């Protein structure tokens, strides 16, 4: 995958024609606007070739004979050319911007949709900063290719073509000298090209790493401040930005060679042309107007040639960004597998010989798990850190797929069920609360397509079950109050209870609780524990517990160690066995 925080991970090197071909697929629906932009740029280019022709005719014929009486046409033609050129330039910019912004929208939506469809392993491989960078920054790099760079390529290429036609028409011998120079320029540019693309790719990876450093420092600001980590974070970011500066300077050196090399070759060509023109003038093979028009066209040719050579560096940045973009778009989506639909499951779960490894060579996080959870049963999962509790519950909504074995819901393997239907059967409350920068009602009813689909009476009941009504009623806008980034306007306990209210609103037959009362004070914990116990009634519930006092009333407690089930039974049965659970219980209550 292209988007990664590791500088060692690079996107697959695809060919430039491959990138352009894929971009063309996004351009094709806007073909009419694209053609209008091309026509407008062609008009702009054509006006460049007319000006030297007017000057040539003026010098050769304008100071005598019949043409002298028509000199008023010259300023009129110049004004007319300026008007036509201005209108065409506006049209080209407008229509191409129209196309590029629609392409930008489609690319961003495609990338974001692919992010939403990516498997959980994708989010473990990539940092949030690198994904944000890809969707926001990298697409803008491609936008530069589609606007400024493309305008330069098309308009200035047409201008060069128009001027070359005039040059051949005026003096083909002198034009051949120019034609000799162009392949030399092209060869030099191709050599610089390869260097620029390599540097751009490394620069892109380092940019992702720098963004990740900022994300960590900003997200963990409390730890940074309490532990005096400001100097460490500053040194870390300084080291990263210095590496970025080094690559930026190498890119500047490689890109900076374009202009002086082009200008030197242009000056050399002009010197040779002047020498040949003087010889032709002595042999009456050229006129004053012809030579002046030729030199003028040559001078007009330098500017678009310069633009064409300068466009190389941003174009390479855009093509490198395209590698990242298409790398993300090509990310495999979650396997959908079977299409069997279920309305509401009973909640009977079976884990049959389930083994799971993180990576092909990793240690087994789960090893031959056999577990039957009856419909409506409350099963607590306990064990030391790293024993496999979280991994086990992550397999249920198919965030990950078992390495071997299978999980069965109501007699059907999870792989045979519609993934969307399966996840509708599961509500999840974690100690790591995730809330959205939206209203309280929208967070409780998360998943509703729009505000009109939210059942406000149901939201109210969910808030009551989570003991949040008093808090919400005291807010200025009630359930329509915006809670800020990840609920930043709420206290830790209020955030946890809002997550519980979301699970209550969903009313799923299967409930997963991962230390759901960990962030609550004693009073709130008693209230929410009572609400959770009511919520768990009639639902299949898996509870991950670190505080054993919260799961004493579970129907069954399953103890895991090193990815295996080592004990199972009720709280009293496990204490009587005096095994691992009893040991954990003694340690925990001794510290209390």
Swiss-Prot record:
Recorded catalytic activity of this chain's protein: ATP + H2O + lipid A-core oligosaccharideSide 1 = ADP + phosphate + lipid A-core oligosaccharideSide 2
This protein's UniProt keywords: ATP-binding, Cell inner membrane, Cell membrane, Lipid transport, Membrane, Nucleotide-binding, Translocase, Transmembrane, Transmembrane helix, Transport
Membrane topology according to the record: Multi-pass membrane protein
Membrane-crossing residue ranges in chain numbering: 31-51, 76-96, 134-154, 161-181, 261-281, 288-308
GO cellular component, one term: plasma membrane
Annotated Pfam families: ABC_membrane, ABC_tran
Compartments it resides in: Cell inner membrane
Primary enzyme class: translocase
Domain ABC transmembrane type-1 residues, every copy: 35-317
Residues binding ATP: 383-390
Residue intervals of the ABC transporter domain: 349-587
EC number: 7.5.2.6
Main localization, broad class: membrane
UniProt GO molecular function: ABC-type oligopeptide transporter activity; ATP binding; ATP hydrolysis activity; ATPase-coupled lipid transmembrane transporter activity
Function: Involved in lipopolysaccharide (LPS) biosynthesis. Translocates lipid A-core from the inner to the outer leaflet of the inner membrane. Transmembrane domains (TMD) form a pore in the inner membrane and the ATP-binding domain (NBD) is responsible for energy generation.
Record text about domains: In MsbA the ATP-binding domain (NBD) and the transmembrane domain (TMD) are fused.
Family statement: Belongs to the ABC transporter superfamily. Lipid exporter (TC 3.A.1.106) family.
Subunit structure: Homodimer.
NCBIfam families: MsbA_lipidA
Name of the molecule in the record: ATP-dependent lipid A-core flippase
Organism: Ralstonia nicotianae (strain ATCC BAA-1114 / GMI1000) (Ralstonia solanacearum)
Gene: msbA
């Amino acid at each position: 995958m292209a988007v990664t925080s590791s500088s060692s991970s690079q996107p697959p090197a695809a060919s430039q024609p491959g990138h352009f071909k894929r971009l063309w697929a996004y351009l094709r629906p806007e073909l009419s606007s694209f053609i209008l932009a091309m026509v407008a740029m062609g008009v702009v280019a054509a006006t460049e070739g007319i000006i030297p022709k007017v000057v040539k005719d003026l010098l050769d014929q304008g100071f005598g004979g019949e043409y002298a009486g028509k000199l008023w046409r010259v300023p009129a033609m110049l004004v007319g050319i300026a008007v036509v050129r201005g209108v065409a330039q506006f049209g080209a910019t407008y229509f191409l911007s129209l196309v590029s912004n629609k392409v930008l929208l489609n690319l961003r939506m495609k990338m974001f949709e692919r992010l939403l469809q990516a498997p959980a392993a994708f989010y473990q491989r990539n940092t949030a900063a690198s994904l944000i960078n890809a969707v926001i920054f990298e697409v803008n790099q491609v936008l530069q290719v589609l606007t400024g760079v493309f305008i330069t390529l098309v308009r200035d290429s047409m201008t060069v073509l128009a001027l070359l036609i005039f040059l051949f028409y005026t003096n083909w011998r002198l034009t051949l000298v120019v034609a000799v120079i162009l392949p030399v320029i092209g060869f030099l540019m191709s050599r610089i090209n390869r260097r620029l693309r390599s540097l751009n790719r490394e620069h892109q990876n380092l940019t992702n790493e720098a963004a990740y450093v900022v994300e960590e420092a900003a997200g963990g600001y409390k730890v940074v401040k309490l532990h005096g980590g400001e100097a460490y974070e500053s040194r870390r970011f300084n080291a990263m930005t210095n590496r970025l500066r080094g690559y930026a300077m190498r890119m500047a050196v490689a890109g900076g060679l374009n202009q002086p090399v082009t200008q030197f070759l242009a000056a050399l060509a002009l010197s040779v042309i002047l020498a040949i023109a003087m010889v032709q003038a002595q042999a009456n093979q050229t006129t004053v107007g012809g030579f002046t028009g030729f030199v003028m066209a040559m001078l007009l040719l330098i500017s678009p040639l310069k633009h064409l050579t300068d466009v190389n560096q941003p174009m390479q940045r855009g093509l490198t960004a395209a590698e990242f973009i298409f790398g993300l778009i090509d990310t495999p989506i979650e396997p959908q597998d079977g299409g069997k639909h279920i309305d509401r499951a009973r909640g009977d779960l079976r884990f049959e010989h389930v083994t799971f490894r993180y990576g092909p060579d990793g240690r087994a996080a789960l090893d031959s798990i056999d577990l039957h959870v009856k419909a409506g049963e409350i099963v607590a999962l306990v064990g030391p850190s790293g024993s496999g509790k979280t991994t086990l519950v992550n397999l249920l909504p198919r965030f990950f797929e078992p390495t071997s074995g299978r999980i069965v819901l109501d007699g059907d393997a999870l792989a045979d069920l519609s993934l969307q239907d399966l996840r509708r059967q599961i509500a999840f409350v974690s100690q790591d609360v995730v809330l959205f920068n939206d209203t309280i009602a929208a967070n409780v009813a998360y998943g509703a397509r729009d505000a009109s689909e939210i059942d406000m009476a149901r939201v109210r009941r969910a808030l009551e079950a989570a003991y949040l009504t008093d808090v919400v009623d005291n807010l200025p806008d009630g359930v329509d109050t915006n809670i800020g980034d990840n609920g930043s306007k709420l206290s830790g306990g209020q955030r946890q209870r809002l997550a519980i209210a979301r699970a209550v609103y969903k009313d799923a037959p299967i409930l997963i609780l991962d230390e759901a009362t960990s962030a609550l004070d004693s009073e709130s914990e008693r209230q929410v524990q009572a609400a959770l116990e009511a919520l768990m009634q009639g639902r299949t519930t898996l509870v991950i517990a670190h505080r054993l006092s919260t799961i004493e009333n579970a129907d069954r407690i399953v103890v895991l160690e090193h990815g295996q089930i080592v004990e199972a039974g009720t709280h009293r049965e496990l204490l009587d066995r005096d095994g691992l659970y009893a040991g954990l219980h003694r340690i925990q209550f001794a510290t209390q």
